[in-house]
């Protein structure tokens, strides 16, 4: 079997939609409770976090809406549920902080990325406030102006 190429940053999957839909205020690193077939699929990069979010139940954090596609070569004696809820591993202080923030009106907890940290798979979660439509337009406008500015600086150096 050919050696798999590693991601340069160790990133497995990102939730770009979350950065567009929320003002990210604080980030946390959480471990994940996974089964064997899920780890194999994540090594192959078969994960999506597009509509994923974090819920707190009974003092524990759970990741909902993430999709890990099972490999075709995975074991057949284990029933693979690609969209099952996965437990997040946070310490007590982090759980209390997330719980207090989510209890406030307007705050939510979303998953931003899945990545490798040494030999472990971690999930970057964040506390954020939802953006309104005009906030999203402002963000796009600001990004476009920054891009134009960078392009002008780059072209100025070529003209000299």
Curated annotation (Swiss-Prot):
Pfam families per UniProt: SmpB
Localization of this protein: Cytoplasm
One GO cellular component, as annotated: cytosol
Name of the protein: SsrA-binding protein
GO biological process terms on file: trans-translation
Assigned protein family: Belongs to the SmpB family.
NCBIfam families the record matches: PRK05422.1 (NF003843), smpB (TIGR00086)
Role this protein plays: Required for rescue of stalled ribosomes mediated by trans-translation. Binds to transfer-messenger RNA (tmRNA), required for stable association of tmRNA with ribosomes. tmRNA and SmpB together mimic tRNA shape, replacing the anticodon stem-loop with SmpB. tmRNA is encoded by the ssrA gene; the 2 termini fold to resemble tRNA(Ala) and it encodes a 'tag peptide', a short internal open reading frame. During trans-translation Ala-aminoacylated tmRNA acts like a tRNA, entering the A-site of stalled ribosomes, displacing the stalled mRNA.
HAMAP family: SmpB (MF_00023)
Keyword Cytoplasm: yes
Family matches, as InterPro entries: SmpB, SsrA-bd_prot, SsrA-bd_prot_CS
SUPFAM superfamilies in UniProt: Small protein B (SmpB)
């Amino acid at each position: 079997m050919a050696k798999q190429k590693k991601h340069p940053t160790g990133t497995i999957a990102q939730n770009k939609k979350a950065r567009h839909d929320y003002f990210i205020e604080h980030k946390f690193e959480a471990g994940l409770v996974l089964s064997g077939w899920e780890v194999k699929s994540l090594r192959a990069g078969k994960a999506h976090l597009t509509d994923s979010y974090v819920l707190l139940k009974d003092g524990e954090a759970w990741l909902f809406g993430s999709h890990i596609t099972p490999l075709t070569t995975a074991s057949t004696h284990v029933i693979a549920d690609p969209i099952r809820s996965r437990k997040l591993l946070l310490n007590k202080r982090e759980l209390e902080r997330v719980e207090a923030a989510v209890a406030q009106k307007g705050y939510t907890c979303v998953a931003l990325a899945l990545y490798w940290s040494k030999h472990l798979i971690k999930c970057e979660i964040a506390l954020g406030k939802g953006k309104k439509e005009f906030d999203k337009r402002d963000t796009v406008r600001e990004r476009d102006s920054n891009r134009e500015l960078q392009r002008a600086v780059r072209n100025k150096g070529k003209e000299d």
